[in-house]
Amino acid sequence: DLAGWMTAAAMANTLGSVIDLTLVESEAIGTIGVGESTIPPLLLFNRLLGIGEADFMRATKATFKLGIKFENWRDVGETYFHSFGSVGKDHWSAGFQHFWLHGLQNGHTHSLDDYCLELKAALEGKFAHLPDERMNYSYHIDSGRYAAFLRQRAEADGTKRIEGRID
């Protein structure tokens, strides 16, 4: 169970020397789903655990993603892409959207979406690690492989596993 092993790995990593941690898990309860669409906070979670990105990607067969595409969003055939990025750059005097709206009122025709790096890159199928780490991204992973990866780390940090069910 991914949620259980995420919790165990985090607790074992941060509190392992002061607690005894046991995870109860049943092999009889199958894994629900295989592919997992993640969001950017997973990068922070992995950093908390000291997991390097290359090791994580290899272990989970991860691919990069810059947002989530929703098909048939409001109507059949309509799509919506929720980018992980921010739009434009705020100024000390006002948020970017105020400048963009002012531009629209004065004949500017660019969509607000044109000012989101992650959205533009996703729509063009491009990705790069930028030196300033300003690209917001996440991963699509094999959740079963991630659970196994975290289990290995949690057990190495002292977590014990018991086969069973709690009713």
Predicted regions and their residues:
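Amphipathic alpha-helical segments that form well-ordered structural scaffolds
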Residues: 10, 41-48, 145-153
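Dinucleotide-binding Rossmann-like beta1-alpha1 core, especially the glycine-rich loop
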Residues: 30-33, 37-122
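Glycine-rich FAD pyrophosphate-binding loop
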Residues: 10-34
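Conserved aromatic-histidine-acidic binding/catalytic patches
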Residues: 3, 30, 34, 134-142
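Beta1/beta-strand and adjacent pyrophosphate-binding region of the FAD-binding site
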Residues: 1-3, 22
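N-terminal Rossmann-fold NAD(P) dinucleotide-binding loop
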Residues: 4-8
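Helix-loop-beta segment of a Rossmann-like dinucleotide-binding subdomain
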Residues: 116-148
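A conserved short coil-to-beta-strand element within the FAD-binding core of flavoproteins
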Residues: 160-167
